[in-house]
Amino acid sequence: MCGICGQFRFDGKKVSSKSLDMMMSKLARRGPDSSGKWIEGAIGFGHQRLSIIDLSNLGSQPMVDEKLGLTLVFNGTIYNYKSLRALLVSLGYIFFSNSDTEVIIKAYHCWGVECLERLDGMFAFAIWDEDSQKLFIARDRMGIKPFYYNASSKAFIFASNSQALLTQDLDKSINPVALQQQLSLHGVVPAPNTIINGIQKLKPGTFIILNTDGEIQEKTYWSPSAKRPSENISDQEYIERTHELLTAAVTKRMDASDVPIGVLLSGGL
């Protein structure tokens, strides 16, 4: 559970290091192992790290790939990063770390926004593309990893929690509709709303592209299918398939870690 934050300014001002520090202070509990900060004029990223894959400093963030002109902050885990890395190596990419973070950078450089179709995992990340001068942001299909943001004519700011955004100058008034949802829907406020008017959530399965003028392009790259299975199978076959899927899901998560694994059993499964 890492913490990410960032600012992309459109008003001609540079990102303030102190302002970024204020945001990172509200993310510290999410990443106790190390912290990192990167500022380049009007764009700046902050990261609080909880080390899971590649525990060395080479896996630290924000991760900068100077050769590709890309900088990334990322929260999450890419379960199939090893197979993606092998594919990218076969395509000529050279890696300097063993992290899934770097796999995202190379995948984005190789396939652009289509890289999202290849990522199997839980994630929220932001990539600054120096060549195109654009910011690319994406959230995983089910919205497991959080991504909160505020968009104005002056700047686009984002973080893994709303507390980090509340350190900034934005509308902090209560959204009454979202508050009612918070209290009546078991604490769930459907994206993009939050109980704070000046803070939004990026929808699951969605990406955003921003340019230096503050223009925002938002697109849904995945949504669940509402179609019923065409096959006519028995209840026992459904049980067996569910067991197979759960086994496969647990297995791939166990393979994506360089630290000891713990298991929490609820009463549900």
List where the protein language model places each region:
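Cysteine-centered catalytic environments shared across enzyme families
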Residues: 1-269
